[in-house]
């Protein structure tokens, strides 16, 4: 048994990338699937942690506490694409950070349309029940683009 543990430990040291194999790809696939859902259904997917999340939004304003049910975002239309997604795995199979650009146009229900939405996104993700969930987000407008006008959930 001791020999087996030493061999396994040695393999991990020699090839630590095996530990994170698939996490990056799974996260990118899930982010794109959640975005496709939002575009098709004009509302966001179930993507938040059971512990909720903290967020800074592209509109500026103060930090927002998001409940586990997520943000109740609904849109008259939503034509946003995620681009240049990069993932940093912090703890294999448990925690990661995703960074990407969110670009397009949208009209949230009850709010003005945003014709050139262009933001940088950083999200802290945790794996819950086999699915990567949002635990923290920071959205900041890129020069020449704009964020939303929403500053609170209420």
What label would you give each PLM region?
Residues 15-51, 148-154:
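Short, low-complexity N-terminal intrinsically disordered segments enriched in polar/charged residues
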Residues 52-53, 61-62, 103-106, 140-144:
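Solvent-exposed loop/turn segments at secondary-structure junctions
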Residues 118-147:
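Short beta-strand edge/turn micro-motifs at domain boundaries
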Residues 48-64, 71-77, 109:
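A short gly/proline-enriched turn/hairpin at secondary-structure junctions
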Residues 4-15:
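Sec-dependent N-terminal signal peptides
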Residues 34, 44-46, 53, 68, ...:
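Hydrophobic pocket/interface hotspot
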Residues 69-113:
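Surface-exposed, charged secondary-structure patches
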Residues 110-115, 144-150:
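A short acidic/glycine-rich loop-to-helix N-cap element
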């Amino acid at each position: 048994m001791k020999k087996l543990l030493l061999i396994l430990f040695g393999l991990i040291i020699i090839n630590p990338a095996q530990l994170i194999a698939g996490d990056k790809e799974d996260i990118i696939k899930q982010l794109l699937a959640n975005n496709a859902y939002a575009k098709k259904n004009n509302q966001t997917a179930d993507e938040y942690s059971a512990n909720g999340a903290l967020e800074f939004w592209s509109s500026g304003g103060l930090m927002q506490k998001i409940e586990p049910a997520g943000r109740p975002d609904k849109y008259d239309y939503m034509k946003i694409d995620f681009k240049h997604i990069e993932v940093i795995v912090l703890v294999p199979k448990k925690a990661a950070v995703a960074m990407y650009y969110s670009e397009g146009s949208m009209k949230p229900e009850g709010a003005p349309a945003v014709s050139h939405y262009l933001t940088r996104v950083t999200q802290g993700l945790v794996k819950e029940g086999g699915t990567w969930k949002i635990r923290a987000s920071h959205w900041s407008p890129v020069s020449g683009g704009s964020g939303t006008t929403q500053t609170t959930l209420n």
